[in-house]
Amino acid sequence: MEENNDSTENPQQGQGRQNAIKCGWLRKQGGFVKTWHTRWFVLKGDQLYYFKDEDETKPLGTIFLPGNKVSEHPCNEENPGKFLFEVVPGGDRDRMTANHESYLLMASTQNDMEDWVKSIRRVIWGPFGGGIFGQKLEDTVRYEKRYGNRLAPMLVEQCVDFIRQRGLKEEGLFRLPGQANLVKELQDAFDCGEKPSFDSNTDVHTVASLLKLYLRELPEPVIPYAKYEDFLSCAKLLSKEEEAGVKELAKQVKSLPVVNYNLLKYICRFLDEVQSYSGVNKMSVQNLATVFGPNILRPKVEDPLTIMEGTVVVQQLMSVMISKHDCLFPKDAELQSKPQDGVSNNNEIQKKATMGQLQNKENNNTKDSPSRQCSWDKSESPQRSSMNNGSPTALSGSKTNSPKNSVHKLDVSRSPPLMVKKNPAFNKGSGIVTNGSFSSSNAEGLEKTQTTPNGSLQARRSSSLKVSGTKMGTHSVQNGTVRMGILNSDTLGNPTNVRNMSWLPNGYVTLRDNKQKEQAGELGQHNRLSTYDNVHQQFSMMNLDDKQSIDSATWSTSSCEISLPENSNSCRSSTTTCPEQDFFGGNFEDPVLDGPPQDDLSHPRDYESKSDHRSVGGRSSRATSSSDNSETFVGNSSSNHSALHSLVSSLKQEMTKQKIEYESRIKSLEQRNLTLETEMMSLHDELDQERKKFTMIEIKMRNAERAKEDAEKRNDMLQKEMEQFFSTFGELTVEPRRTERGNTIWIQ
């Protein structure tokens, strides 16, 4: 706060006086004698200028407002005509001025003083979010945008939320007044940039009065002055023809500025919620319209005649806006179509898996389903070199002759992904399909091809293909690729219909065209799959007994066999046979370890005969018991089981480590939470103690002031008594002297 008596600037020249926030006559106390001087004050920008006269151009001084505060002085009974307020340095900030001087000002009326105090506070606290009472709605919304987009100012939302929680059933809501002193304190707190909170002890009527006060203090009401006559005409039209009046009213509402429109919509919807409890709170639509109508819609010149003429019309108009707010303020289509955020990845996986199962059921129930073809053939060498690096790359697809029009979308993201693991501990190309099923929908005349590096196998099947895996983690494919394509039953070898399957970072499988194979191969090297990327949520909840069942010799509870019955309508997984029967049976050989495959697609007849032979073999193997199957593959069981046992042990160890790590994190977070709660409780206790100390100090200050006043009164009484005593004593001493002089005895 600075006073510049030697200012050479001329703030009132040109348009300076037009840009003034407020101007008027005030009396300022100044000088060594502290006498009152009448000055012309002009509030402009962040400074308060004062002049000797209204026509003067050179200010006598300036008061720099930022960093200071303004406070009102209570009315003194001895001087009832003085309305004092003071601009003092410091405020609630750490800023202090150079001269540490305060200014005591006096207004002519109480209203004039309150207007000056509000204007000065708005200048001081405006940059800090304060001074919102009497501030333009646009300025308030513009400042609060830093906290996010809102329909209404934060003060309005805070009051509305509190009333929603505690006041909807309060009788006489918005009709009964709140505590005037508490409303004043809350207003001053908000004007000073504070954010006071309402607790359970706060009076609901006080908060309601604060909300009404904010709307009443707006420089321009929610419905601007320029729209006053237009809205009155809508009200008159409503009385004649309601439908046309509502349409015209909706048109006028849409023409409002955005901030006014949002605030009006927010208030009308809230008031409609309040009137829904009218049976308890006794506040019907008409009562609410009577209370809020003058605060929402009022004329610029509030003379008694205009107010009396427009009261009934404004009440009717406000009633319509509350009761028909759905028509006047339609919900935005964007908000309705916007997807909900915060959905977890596991829930999405479960939902997609469920959709995939429903789709499979629909495909299985189809009577006239097209034929499908499952084939196992040799993978391409470029893909083999890329897979040996340990990174999941784009998977190659077989070439088909099917036309482009016959290709339909293959949805593989609805189910948990399919992956083949190659373990060096296995004797030959031991592939393990882990974690999840692979389902797809088909159209008439389409067939499906699946390729792995372990030889060739082809069989014609119909409907959907589904492969269910184990509960183990997944690894990248080595020395081979997995692909899935759609081909026509008539032709093979057309490259126009090739689809590639690749792994994404979240564990899903995508199908891509063959022309994107190189790009997918480069991207796949950066997307290495974790051990638990493809573990389904429902598998993570299994108990220890279910996990130990993987170590069993027959592997009866977790299988990834692809069943190929010749007369079945679907090609789906079996859960009762050993996985080696399909992956290691039928003379499968690894093209890398054992040389080239024995099956070749160049001989269609041999291909069909081998396919039929393997189909019969698969059907006969499923007809036998699990003991027969174990005897058939007794040669490979020992090494495979040892490898599986080591894999399961490593996975269990990793899960145990993760469990210990997560438990330690949880314990540390809980400990931190307890520490913070203890600190918060101590801070609350300290705050309560400080509040009690402050209250005690206030009481002591008041007692001291009263004692001071009593002492002054006693001093005055003593002074009067002493004066009276001295005057009386003086008269008594003077009269005897005069008597002695009059009775003088002369001695001769």
Curated annotation (Swiss-Prot):
Annotated region described as Disordered, given as residue ranges: 1-20, 354-476, 582-641
Compositional bias ranges of the Basic and acidic residues kind: 600-615
Listed result of changing R175A: Loss of function
Record's subcellular location: Cytoplasm, Cytoskeleton; Cell junction, Adherens junction; Cell junction, Focal adhesion; Cell projection
UniProt domain Rho-GAP: residue ranges: 135-329
Major subcellular site: cytoplasm
CDD domains: PH_RhoGap24, RhoGAP_ARHGAP22_24_25
Cited Gene3D superfamilies: Pleckstrin-homology domain (PH domain)/Phosphotyrosine-binding domain (PTB), Rho GTPase activation protein
Domain-level remarks: The coiled coil domain mediates the interaction with FLNA leading to its recruitment to lamellae.
Protein name in UniProt: Rho GTPase-activating protein 24
Organism: Homo sapiens
Taxonomic lineage of the native organism: Eukaryota, Metazoa, Chordata, Craniata, Vertebrata
Gene: ARHGAP24
